[in-house]
Swiss-Prot record:
GO terms for cellular component: plasma membrane. Disulfide bonds: none annotated. This is Protoheme IX farnesyltransferase. Carbon 2 of the heme B porphyrin ring is defined according to the Fischer nomenclature. Its main location: membrane. It comes from Arthrobacter sp. (strain FB24). GO terms for molecular function: protoheme IX farnesyltransferase activity.
Amino acid sequence: MSTTDTPLNASRLPGKIGIARKAKAYLALTKPRVIELLLVSTLPTMIYAERGFPSFGLILATLVGGAFAAGSAGAFNCYIDRDIDKLMHRTENRPLVTGEVTPREALVFSWLLGAAAIAILWFGANPLSAWLGLGAIVFYVVIYTMILKRRTAQNIVWGGAAGCFPVLIAWAAVTDTVEWPAIVLFMVIFLWTPPHYWPLSMRYGEDYRNANVPMLGAIAGAKVVSVQVVLYAWAMVACSLLLIPAGGAGWVYTVTAVVAGAWFLYESHALYNRAQGGDVSNKGAMKVFHGSISYLTLLFIALAVDPFVGSAIMG
């Protein structure tokens, strides 16, 4: 892996670029679409932990600190993976590949964003949430990006745990501790990550093979991947229901978890049936990918609404 400050694709290096374009390039380093998905789980978890709305200042600090932590991790990832990003069509326009940002600039930006995240969480929420934010960055950068991603097809399973930290950060920001409901939500996202990401890796399998990254969807056939998607989907839905006895969930969350879970299981089994019949397509795989986002969004919207409607089903 190159560690020089020379852009990987010098032929694409633009001349002097304007402030707006430079700012847009820095924003792209943070992977904003990933941040959006992570923040979907943050505010609902805070509301559920508080059983109402926390203070505006706490919400703002947690959302901004969490976004900065995720952005720092994403920028570090772009810096480390700049050698393989140029080999994949999906990532060939990232700023370090195009030369809009130099490796040195990206590295400094990553450190500054991470430091800001920890400071905001520490002083705006509490030290526990800051430590969890640091843990999320380290886990994603070191465990996933540097150790697992290029070595094992199970990379996204264990490395994906970094994406589960926002619920722990959110819960800790409100309660200054981590309790069973937060752990259940952590596990829901942990089990959600493979059936979310593996269909995407099926769609971009050629990219990952070109970069020699052993994503399961790239190195295993659709039959194998579809089995794993179904198994993780069932485990995820079952885990989501643990919030009823372990977290005092009410009817809004419960009904949503059952209905949305049943729908996602249907889509997962549809992918499985097509794959086993040799009729899987990129469109079918992406349907499950997009469906997983809808499922998680619905689940956490229900989590946010639940404290305001009725009472706990158990306890």
